[in-house]
Amino acid sequence: MDKSKVAVLRTTPQTVVEDYHRLCQLAGMRQALDTSKTTIIKDNISWHLLYPGANTTPWQLEGTIQSLKAEGFNDLVCVHNKTVVTIADLGDRYNKFGPVLNKYGVPKKYNYKPEDMTWVRYQPKAKMLVLDKIFRD
């Protein structure tokens, strides 16, 4: 496995959406992901309200989608999850993700709704140090 890459770029309010494409290029997105597979966009909703330092912002989401599409990633889906501190529907609405996803035809799925996806049991093939002791089933 290749080492992780971190890309940092100076931006401005006028260029921030476009700058995401350059960030994705610098980080090696095209080499790390397979255009023939469905690409899951996992937004971060730490709280229902907009907290730019804690949540995905609409401009991050739009810049990422634009970059993915420009690089040939056309099978995109945004997946929301449920936590003890978030209500995904409210976070999606309050953080203004819906208009961005609709603009680019990216469907929303919820990993806790049976109609959206099912969970498959994963059995690690390697010996685990402690994970199997913490999560026994």
Residue ranges and their predicted role:
Residues 1-137:
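N-terminal and secondary-structure boundary signal
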